[in-house]
Structures are given as structure tokens and as C-alpha cells.
Swiss-Prot record:
Annotated disulfide bonds: none
The family this protein is said to belong to: Belongs to the neurotoxin 31 family.
Subcellular location: Secreted
Propeptide: 19-38
Signal peptide (UniProt feature, chain positions): 1-18
Keywords from the named record: Disulfide bond, Secreted, Signal, Toxin
Gene Ontology MF terms in the entry: toxin activity
Protein name as catalogued: U12-lycotoxin-Ls1a
Tissue occurrence: Expressed by the venom gland.
Cellular compartments per GO CC: extracellular region
Organism taxonomic ancestry: Eukaryota, Metazoa, Ecdysozoa, Arthropoda, Chelicerata
The keyword Metal-binding appears for this protein: no
Record note on modification: Contains 5 disulfide bonds.
């Protein structure tokens, strides 16, 4: 009888644990979304060419001239780039 109770309890625990793992897998990872759906991109993430506001925060600007990467990626802004982004009035954080 003890064996049956332990086995039943183990199956319930296993079922609950596997459901929580499936829920985590179903959640959409924000980095997997295209930049336009995220609202803004973090540093070293793809961004929209010519749009510094597509990078999150005042520290990020869109850089399309990286020597080792194709495409545009957010990078840390220099002092002048930070000022230019501030005056653009970007809405993201």
C-alpha cells in the first residue's frame, strides 16, 4: 500500500513539474522577436538602420558599420551621440 501511495505521489509531482517546464518553453523570449515588435533593442542586438531611437536607453545608438558583423546593431553611444539622441526625443527607455 505504501508503495502505491509513493508511486502515485511521484507521478503527480512529475506531471506538475513537466507542465511548468512546458509553460516556460511556450513563453516568447523577447530577444527572439523582431526589433519592431520589442519596441527597442538592447546593446549588441539588431536595430533599424538610421534610427537611433530603435536602441533602448540613452546609452544605445544604431551602428551599421561594424567591421566584423553584417547588419545594424546597437552600440554604446559616445558623448556627442548621446546628446544627439537626447534632442531627437526618443520615447523608449
Amino acid at each position: 500500500m505504501k508503495f502505491a501511495v509513493i508511486l502515485l505521489f511521484s507521478l503527480v509531482v512529475l506531471t506538475v513539474a513537466s507542465e511548468s517546464v512546458e509553460e516556460v518553453r511556450r513563453e516568447i523570449d523577447i530577444e527572439d522577436l523582431p526589433e519592431q515588435q520589442r519596441g527597442c533593442a538592447d546593446l549588441r542586438q539588431p536595430c533599424t538602420e538610421g534610427d537611433d531611437c530603435s536602441c533602448c536607453g540613452s546609452e544605445g545608438v544604431c551602428n551599421c558599420s561594424h567591421p566584423h558583423k553584417k547588419g545594424c546593431y546597437c552600440k554604446t553611444a559616445g558623448p556627442l551621440e548621446k546628446l544627439a539622441k537626447k534632442f531627437k526625443g526618443c520615447k523608449n527607455k
